[in-house]
Amino acid sequence: MASSWPPLELQSSNQSQLFPQNATACDNAPEAWDLLHRVLPTFIISICFFGLLGNLFVLLVFLLPRRQLNVAEIYLANLAASDLVFVLGLPFWAENIWNQFNWPFGALLCRVINGVIKANLFISIFLVVAISQDRYRVLVHPMASRRQQRRRQARVTCVLIWVVGGLLSIPTFLLRSIQAVPDLNITACILLLPHEAWHFARIVELNILGFLLPLAAIVFFNYHILASLRTREEVSRTRCGGRKDSKTTALILTLVVAFLVCWAPYHFFAFLEFLFQVQAVRGCFWEDFIDLGLQLANFFAFTNSSLNPVIYVFVGRLFRTKVWELYKQCTPKSLAPISSSHRKEIFQLFWRN
């Protein structure tokens, strides 16, 4: 796989494998690569722009009011902080692709940017698991723990998630380097794996620890959450004919589906990449298919960081309440001639789905 270097990982364990002498033998899609070089940077900058604004706004809404965060807000604020750090590194990769993978920023940023990307992969999914687990405890086992205990556990959990995410990104930080590629006349930021066994370790870390195991936990928690909500909805309809918790149900489904849609393609192509490395699949078709697929899947997964403010916050009622509280706190009374009750009605109509 000579023509591309996906931001998260590299495909080869040594430079001779990465850049064979007949590097253009499988260059069967030059038009596709030219299109990617033109389109992807704009796409990445758009993700950075909206992700920066969205996650900054989320953090401001959570942190500006001078009161203690509840459990859900602790997790969501950490998720926004992780995504904010991540999107700050995207302009570097946009410039890298504009230059056709010629890395102009030096060895240190090569390591730091890719380490941040790798850490975000784990931190985000682990936070999704933590959010699902907390909601599972609240809705399925409401008497299992008290609110103060849950808040303390949420803080500890978030610290551990950041530490674990940082530790799992250490190999990327240590093994990333810039290498000259004379055949292509570029200096690339690449990950050189020192031994063939690292390919297996990488797929275990990336696909199993970073996707399949968290996905199993998310499915387990959300299945029981949805079952509990359906039971409550049936009871509610029987007693008062109303629909309750429909917003929560929709939010949970949105979380799971959005995560799968954004990240499943990347892990699929990462697994195909592993099969190519162990020569389970061969040929130019698979090389070009995996190279191009990884590029697209990488940055499609990145959209999750700009969607998180919408998916995890704006879809739910929690954030709407926080925005309203912040609005009342920051709006001078002299600038509010209408009554607070009318203002609240207008605000509720504005946010009504």
From Swiss-Prot:
Glycan-carrying positions? N14, N22, N185
In this entry, the parts of the chain located on the Cytoplasmic side of the membrane are 65-73, 134-155, 227-247, 315-353
Membrane-spanning intervals of the chain: 41-64, 74-98, 112-133, 156-178, 200-226, 248-272, 292-314
Q: Name one GO cellular component term.
A: plasma membrane
Positions of disulphide bridges: C110-C189
Against SUPFAM superfamilies, the record matches this protein to: Family A G protein-coupled receptor-like
**Pfam families annotated for this entry?**
7tm_1 (PF00001)
Location comes to: Cell membrane
Its Gene Ontology biological processes? cell migration; G protein-coupled receptor signaling pathway; inflammatory response; negative regulation of blood pressure; negative regulation of cell growth; positive regulation of cytosolic calcium ion concentration; positive regulation of leukocyte migration; positive regulation of release of sequestered calcium ion into cytosol
List keywords of the entry alphabetically.
Cell membrane, Disulfide bond, G-protein coupled receptor, Glycoprotein, Lipoprotein, Membrane, Palmitate, Receptor, Transducer, Transmembrane, Transmembrane helix
- Extracellular side, ranges: 1-40, 99-111, 179-199, 273-291
Task: Give the record's membrane topology.
Answer: Multi-pass membrane protein
Q: Classify the main location.
A: membrane
Q: Which InterPro entries does this one have?
A: Brdyknn_1_rcpt, Brdyknn_rcpt, CCR1-9-like, GPCR_Rhodpsn, GPCR_Rhodpsn_7TM
Q: Matching CDD domains, A to Z?
A: 7tmA_BK-1
User: What GO molecular-function term can you cite, just one?
Assistant: peptide binding
> Gene3D superfamilies of this UniProt entry?
Rhodopsin 7-helix transmembrane proteins (1.20.1070.10)
Q: Where is the lipid attached (S-palmitoyl cysteine)?
A: C330
PANTHER family linked to this entry = B2 BRADYKININ RECEPTOR, CELL ADHESION MOLECULE
General function of this protein: This is a receptor for bradykinin. Could be a factor in chronic pain and inflammation.
Family listed = Belongs to the G-protein coupled receptor 1 family. Bradykinin receptor subfamily. BDKRB1 sub-subfamily.
What protein does this entry describe? Answer: B1 bradykinin receptor
State the organism named in the record.
Homo sapiens (Human)
Gene behind the chain: BDKRB1
